[in-house]
Amino acid sequence: MKNPTLLQYFHWYYPDGGKLWSELAERADGLNDIGINMVWLPPACKGASGGYSVGYDTYDLFDLGEFDQKGTIATKYGDKRQLLTAIDALKKNNIAVLLDVVVNHKMGADEKERIRVQRVNQDDRTQIDDNIIECEGWTRYTFPARAGQYSNFIWDYHCFSGIDHIENPDEDGIFKIVNDYTGDGWNDQVDDEMGNFDYLMGENIDFRNHAVTEEIKYWARWVMEQTHCDGFRLDAVKHIPAWFYKEWIEHVQAVAPKPLFIVAEYWSHEVDKLQTYIDQVDGKTMLFDAPLQMKFHEASRQGAEYDMRHIFTGTLVEADPFHAVTLVANHDTQPLQALEAPVEPWFKPLAYALILLRENGVPSVFYPDLYGASYEDSGENGETCRVDMPVINQLDRLILARQRFAHGIQTLFFDHPNCIAFSRSGTEENPGCVVVLSNGDDGEKTLLLGDNYANKTWRDFLGNRDEYVVTNDQGEATFFCNAGSVSVWVIEDV
């Protein structure tokens, strides 16, 4: 795939009503036209909150909007037929499809069970109370409406290591379930935040139970057969033992008809943790570059005070570009969400230019930046807040520029705290470009591009600058950009 470019086709507040799959099918042609060649779909499985579920409260992995469960047949995004129609439309446009895999936990159990649990210190999960509590917990999943179709696996308390609510006595908190697999506490090879970050929410799936890991492998084979997907986005992997995903990825790659594109969400701003995880899974997955996303957030807030020479310092794309998926925003970092770190709209064209036009990493584009979004939710103070996320002007042009001009050797000119630039040399088949951006005043860079670019006339592909630039006999010229803006200079006749 030439210059892979991923679009996250949803956000946390996408409207209810089952319209997303149909909307995506209608837009598939246009996505191909601007240069999107991979789409990350929201979780397609039935969630505990039914038609209102964003998809991360997984109830039934085998219900893609087919069974009347949790008050609805369709998911928030549509029914199974509409999902498959959307996937077919994408594939007809040579756009690869990534499914979102949410197997850290389950929610919305069908039945209670008598269980035994131990209280856990929420701030240090390694501190587990010796006292064992006899209680009831919602831990049994029978999926009565599906009635064994596709899978007859019944989930019970042996499949889980933790829970956040018990009854008789009624109590909320974090509780370690006592069963045949939890004698040593939580799983290893997880993030060390809170002492051990195995537990996140709901009924925490325990991968030490062999029947559980085999069921999740079976589900992967099933969902690939049902959807013919081209890869996966793996949710919340910092809470899942790395050894499981190493094993799972080996399995799905072995049974898939062609190599799968796999990217995992390990949300940490410590690049060392990301590199450790990549090592633990033998490099079998890419990771989202959370440190870079935070850099963009900080740069957008600080304006001209931010030193752009260091925008990539301490990021995954700098440390390990072959395993980095770069991004400006996602459904967790958007305003009012759990990992809120929004990038101010003025800076987004600069950020997208830095991930779309450089050779390092695979860039991910966020739905609201391409289409806009408006929504309301409660803020930290409990009051309702309205958020308007505008369409980022010229984002479609930047995506198109990636396919047309982001080719050849890359040279960086990160020699000024506010105005930086980079060039792509082009190849025999494809032209290159010069990218100049500034987080301060109007900027300019005098660049020597070499004899191949002697006496060429250049224009700003984005149209932010009206003048033309002409290189001299040595291929040297001064290229410009506006204050707080970016320009992509290309040869006039390409």
UniProtKB/Swiss-Prot annotation:
GO cellular component, one term: cytoplasm
Subcellular location: Cytoplasm
Binding site for Ca(2+): N104, D198, H239
Name of the encoding gene: amyA
Organism from which the protein derives: Salmonella typhimurium (strain LT2 / SGSC1412 / ATCC 700720)
Name of this chain's protein: Cytoplasmic alpha-amylase
Gene Ontology BP terms: carbohydrate metabolic process
Coarse class of the protein's main subcellular location: cytoplasm
Keywords: Calcium, Carbohydrate metabolism, Cytoplasm, Glycosidase, Hydrolase, Metal-binding, Sodium
Enzyme class: hydrolase
SMART domains the record matches: Aamy (SM00642)
Active site (UniProt): D235, E265
